[in-house]
């Protein structure tokens, strides 16, 4: 009887192991036909996890395009940057779906994107872009739910899309990863608002690219925490006109830099100031 029990037990273990091992043979990273060979992918990190800000792993998503070849319709946008050519972003931009946009906190983040697993439409190589806009969900649709949660989706400028896929594809599977942003010159601070409501757009941010905290300081006070208004516009109701201003900026990877004496005492609204240094 004991021998029979052992045989049943061993057979049961073999069944369990078979159920566990077989699905593993269908993992990510396989090349289908003559498709562009893609890197291995991992489970996407939580968008609020700063430790994953520059996670080197690749993740699955999809991509489409919007605007024309000259960047029409890609200017302005939900990150508040305005003229992307004047601000140094140019055509290397994308609008992010809700799952990636993180209520604007991802604005300024940089990604590398490649088309994968679709040999009919994919082109070799990759593009590097900055997140500058939001691709809104359309909850009335039942198909082509590109930017609806929980989809991870990049709506690229047409110029960037054509570097990785053919125009007629429309939408393609891609893999993406966060990369450090490489920017020329210092971080820029553009003033908006009025004497009782100072709003500062911060752009041209290197390193992680996206901002987690901002503080402002005039010569006679300590650091004042600013609130994110929308995109990368940060505000304070403290009256700071007539004072020279410095800024303390923390990016999502936890790096903090102080930008001393960015704005002179006679600064005005609608002006842009160079922070001189970058991440």
Swiss-Prot record:
Pfam families: DPBB_1, Expansin_C. Residues 196-275 form the Expansin-like CBD domain. Residues 1-27 form the signal peptide. It is found in: Secreted, Cell wall; Membrane. GO terms for cellular component: extracellular region; membrane. SUPFAM superfamilies: Barwin-like endoglucanases, PHL pollen allergen. The keyword Signal applies. Its main location: secreted. Belongs to the expansin family. Expansin A subfamily. Causes loosening and extension of plant cell walls by disrupting non-covalent bonding between cellulose microfibrils and matrix glucans. No enzymatic activity has been found. This is Putative expansin-A26. It comes from Arabidopsis thaliana. The gene is EXPA26.
